[in-house]
Amino acid sequence: DFLFARTMIGVFKNIEYMCSRTNSKTWGKEAWKKIVVCVVSDGRAKINPRTRAVLAGLGVYQDGIAKQQVNGKDVTAHIYEYTTQIGMELKGNQVHLKPRSGVPVQMIFCLKEKNQKKINSHRWFFQAFGRVLDPNICVLLDAGTKPGRDSIYHLWRAFDLQPMCGGACGEIKAMLSHGKKLINPLIXA
């Protein structure tokens, strides 16, 4: 739940940043309507119960309605969608939900029935949601990765300025607690 929340807080801040770009032809006050946050979880039995509770608190998950079979056929995945106005904050390793003063966030949550690993989750994202949403760009983040407040905008801008660009990546910095230093410089490399 902590790692998931850290990532989502960063994503929410990026959406707010794009909405704050009032002089932009693409972004601005209504930018949140152009952005969909898709969360894919790998296996109903494997998802952390606290992460599931955070998703329920955001309004994008309902506990107890998922079934393994419908009309005698195995279910592959459970899909939930919601436009949330709930935010999060971290206090230590605790996740606290709170009303968002910022912009709404459109979310889709795909809870795969079986754990089929990360590459299968990526396939789900591109084949299932990519076809329906028809996005200009996609940004993939693992839970625990905290994007800077404008980093997703800069990734988008790289694609916007170079339409023939097929991929881009951002810089990842190690998050250290205040006052901590790495003693072994090889670990930092």
From Swiss-Prot:
Pfam families referenced in this protein's UniProt entry, alphabetically: Chitin_synth_1
Known EC number: 2.4.1.16
Molecular-function annotations in GO: chitin synthase activity
An annotated GO BP: chitin biosynthetic process
A GO term from the CC aspect: cell septum
Subcellular location: Cell membrane
Superkingdom classification of source: Eukaryota
UniProt record similarity statement: Belongs to the chitin synthase family. Class I subfamily.
Protein known as: Chitin synthase 1
Biological source species: Ajellomyces capsulatus
